[in-house]
């Protein structure tokens, strides 16, 4: 069973008009969030993305590896605005992606990871698109 939902994650979900029941589920003790909610989080926090950089592509074999960099402004206690950036890989290959659209899956995985990093939740919460096991465990009530 997963630990209690982190308070900051529950607050973020409330700010985007979602609830844990509509956005999260427990997969073997790890919180998983749906992609739709992460897109809303990116808008709420003003996260912007650079164009992806394709590291490897093999269209015939449906293999794509790319990186995405994201950024957001953070206001410090002293009122100073600082731009915070982070990046991640997104991979889609036949062994980790059953969909017929590897470029879109690689991009979704990379962006979702960057969003989670930029809000301080990566490692505590995962995106539904990071693993088929996560998506397959999604309850019917979660959109």
Residue ranges and their predicted role:
Residues 1-143:
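Polyanion-binding surfaces on beta-sheet-dominated domains and ring/shell assemblies
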């Amino acid at each position: 069973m997963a630990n209690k939902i982190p308070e900051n994650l529950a607050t973020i979900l409330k700010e985007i008009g979602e609830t844990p029941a509509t956005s999260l589920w427990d997969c073997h003790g790890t919180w998983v969030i749906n992609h739709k909610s992460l897109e809303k989080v990116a808008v709420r926090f003003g996260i912007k993305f650079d164009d992806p950089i394709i590291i490897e592509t093999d269209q015939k074999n449906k293999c794509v590896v790319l990186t995405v960099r994201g950024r957001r402004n953070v206001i410090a206690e002293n009122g100073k605005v600082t731009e915070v950036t982070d990046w991640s890989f997104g991979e889609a290959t036949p062994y980790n992606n059953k969909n017929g659209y590897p470029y879109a899956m690689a991009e979704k995985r990379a962006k979702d990871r960057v969003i989670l990093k930029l809000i301080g939740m990566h490692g505590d919460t995962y995106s539904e698109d990071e693993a088929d096991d996560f998506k397959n465990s999604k309850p019917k009530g979660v959109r």
